[in-house]
C-alpha cells in the first residue's frame, strides 16, 4: 500500500524551508513541536504536517 502523492522531507530540507539549522529542527522534533517519524537513523516529515506547522505558527 503506497501513496505516490505522499511527499516527505528530510531534516535538512525542513531546515532549508524554515530557514533554520538542522540542529534546531531536530530539537523541535524531539520536543514534539514538529511531527516526524524516524526511518532507520533519519527523521522524515510529511509535507502535509510541515504545512500545518507553518500555518499554525503564523496564526
Predicted segments with their positions:
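A short, Lys/Arg-enriched interface patch at domain edges and termini
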Residues: 1, 50-59
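A detector for short, charged/polar N-terminal pre-domain segments
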Residues: 1-7
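Residues within the helices of the helix-turn-helix
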Residues: 11-12, 37
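Major-groove DNA-recognition helix of helix-turn-helix-type DNA-binding domains
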Residues: 18-44
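The alpha-helix within a helix-turn-helix
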Residues: 15
